[in-house]
Every structure is written in structure tokens, then in C-alpha cells.
Swiss-Prot record:
One of its GO terms (molecular function) is RNA binding. The keyword Lipid biosynthesis does not apply. NCBIfam families: PRK11180.1, rluA_subfam. This is Ribosomal large subunit pseudouridine synthase D. One of its GO terms (cellular component) is cytoplasm. SMART domains: S4 (SM00363).
Length: 325
């Protein structure tokens, strides 16, 4: 059984010279290039309103894409009664505040116990929406806000909005090192050449842009507010590591805890107990996919993140007092 779904997008200028199938794979990363190629060959892809069936044809940027996608029904995942922290819900979307240690979608090593399983239990009709309406993902140990579509029209609009960078996603993080100013990381990303589970900055990768500003400085660490312009896998984690400021606790990208000299035992206990990357999706702003209403949601920092910040503040204050006296 297949589902019909309309996908729309605009070819961005940075895809100039790409083959059509390559460009569409960049625009629709949830679908494999082989599947996209089948859509092209089956006359399901229109470029500027005209059916195009040559996957190897070049694009120039600015073309309007419409795909009448045929999507095979996914394996039926099991609904599971996993609590969801719902921040906003209406007839078309759900916005949740994801806790740590929760995978978004079933995969290798995580066949169930995910956000997707929880959504199937909470709202059974979402089983008819591809990927149970999941528009974007957060890593297992990243906390915070995610938007989910409850029906196919909402999903189609949200996917397009994400591609056109009309959804604003802001994060808080603790980065290693003392940073002196905010800035922007504009570095393309791809799969790491040797680490199967990691991503890396790569000149032939997909465009990736992260903006960041300093909120607070501590000894050896800096609290940041970040905004995604694109949304690649592990983007903030990779970009911060690339500029030599990996996120505290991010073992995959070099962020193992580095206690400052003379740290108290109480501070060391908190630091050692924080066994994940210090990253939280704190704000999500979007236009409602059906009625166009502006929706902005905020998620407070989780308890372990608050405890970490308080410990960093206490350590910094103790250090300043020791200097003074």
C-alpha cells in the first residue's frame, strides 16, 4: 500500500550545477536518492510546472519543485504508553518538550521506546502520516522542543517551511573554553569518513549555518544561545567542535569534562554526573501550517541543566573570591 503526498520546494542558489536527483536529495533528506530517482523516472516530478524525467539534468537555482510522491506504507510500529510533555496542541500540530534519554525514531539499537511510539499511542490517527508526522529530530540526549504534524497537509506545509528556513529554532548550550564573542559558523557538513555514527565539516557536504551569542562565562566554560539557519544532523555539536569549543559532556565530539584547577568536590560531582551533551532546544517559532497564525513556544531548562549552570556559577564565584582575598 502506498500513500500520496505532495512535496514542494525551491532549488536554492547553492545547488547550482547539481544534478536534479542530487539537488532533490539535499532538499528532501528524509528520502533516499534512489527513491527520488524513481519518482523522477515515473514522471512524478515537476520543475517550474513541467514534468522532468531526467535525473541527470542540471539545476541552476530558483526552480520551483513539485513532487507527487508515492510513499510506501512504513513498517507498523507499536504504539507505546510513553508520557509526552505537550507544550502546544491543536487540530493540526503537536509541539512537545522532549526529555533526555529518549530517541525520536526507531532505528538500529532502538526498535521501540521512542517519540514515534509515544505519538502512535497518544494520537492513533497519526499512523496515517509518514514518519508519524515527525518533521525534524533531536538527538537522544538533547532536550527541548519539537513540532509534529497530525495530518498530511500540515506535514507538507511544515516540511516546506523548514526547507525555506521559515521555522526558527533556538538552543541553549554550555561550550568548552572561554569564548570572547558570538558569531556564525558557516561550514558544510557530511557523514564522518571513518566514524559511522558521527558527522563532520566537509567541503563537499550540505550547507550548514549556526549562529551563536554569549550569554554567560564561567571558568573553562561558556553558556551560549544558538540559532539554527539549517538543520543538519548533529549540526550544533559539530560546528562548536569545529571552532574548538565542543559542548560540555559531548563525548562523540571531544567535549569530555575538563574541571578547572582547584575545583571543589561538590562541583566535580555535578560535572561528572552530567552524562550528555549540554544542549537544549529552548525556543521554537513558526507559522501555523493551516491558518498561518504565528506560534512561539519556550521550554525551560531541564533540572540537570539548571543544576549544572548553578554549579558553574558557584565555582566561578568561589574562584573570584579566592582571587580577591
Amino acid at each position: 500500500m502506498t500513500q500520496q503526498m505532495t512535496l514542494t520546494a525551491e532549488i536554492s542558489a547553492d545547488l547550482l550545477g547539481y544534478r536534479l536527483d542530487q539537488a532533490l536529495a539535499q532538499l528532501f533528506p528524509d528520502y533516499s536518492r534512489s527513491r527520488i530517482k524513481v519518482w523522477i523516472e515515473n514522471d512524478l516530478v515537476k520543475v517550474n510546472g513541467i514534468i522532468v524525467n531526467r535525473a541527470r539534468g542540471k539545476v541552476f537555482g530558483g526552480e520551483q519543485i513539485e513532487i507527487q510522491a508515492e510513499i510506501e506504507e512504513e513498517i507498523r510500529f507499536e504504539p507505546q504508553n510513553i508520557p509526552l510533555n505537550i507544550v502546544h496542541e491543536d487540530d493540526d500540530i503537536i509541539i512537545i518538550n522532549k526529555p533526555k534519554n529518549l530517541v525520536v525514531h526507531p532505528g538500529a539499537g532502538n526498535p521501540d521506546g521512542t517519540v514515534l511510539n509515544a505519538l502512535l499511542y497518544y494520537y492513533p490517527p497519526i499512523a496515517e502520516v509518514p514518519r508519524a508526522g515527525i518533521i525534524h529530530r533531536l538527538d537522544k540526549d538533547t532536550t527541548g522542543l519539537m513540532v509534529v504534524a497530525k495530518n498530511i497537509p500540515a506535514q507538507t506545509h511544515l516540511v516546506t517551511a523548514l526547507q525555506k528556513r521559515r521555522i526558527t529554532r533556538e538552543y541553549e548550550a554550555i561550550a568548552s573554553g572561554i569564548m570572547t564573542q558570538g558569531g556564525k559558523v558557516d561550514e558544510p557538513m557530511a557523514r564522518h569518513p571513518t566514524k559511522r555514527t558521527a558527522m563532520a565539516v566537509h567541503p563537499m557536504g550540505k550547507p550548514a549555518i549556526t549562529h551563536y551569542r554569549i550569554m554567560e562565562r564561567f571558568r573553562n566554560y561558556t553558556r551560549l544561545r544558538l540559532r539554527l539557519e539549517t538543520g543538519r544532523t548533529h549540526q550544533i555539536r559539530v560546528h562548536m567542535a569545529h571552532i574548538a569549543h565542543p559542548l560540555l559532556g559531548d563525548q562523540l565530539y571531544g567535549g569530555r569534562p575538563r574541571p578547572p584547577k582547584g575545583s571543589s568536590e561538590a562541583f566535580l560531582t555535578v560535572l561528572r554526573a552530567f552524562q550528555r551533551q549540554a544542549l537544549h532546544a529552548t525556543m521554537l517559532r513558526l507559522e501555523h501550517p493551516i491558518n498561518g497564525e504565528l506560534i512561539e513556544c519556550h521550554a525551560p531548562l531541564p533540572a540537570d541543566f539548571v543544576e549544572l549552570i548553578e554549579a558553574l556559577k558557584t565555582d566561578y564565584q568561589r574562584y573570584k573570591e579566592d582571587l580577591y582575598y
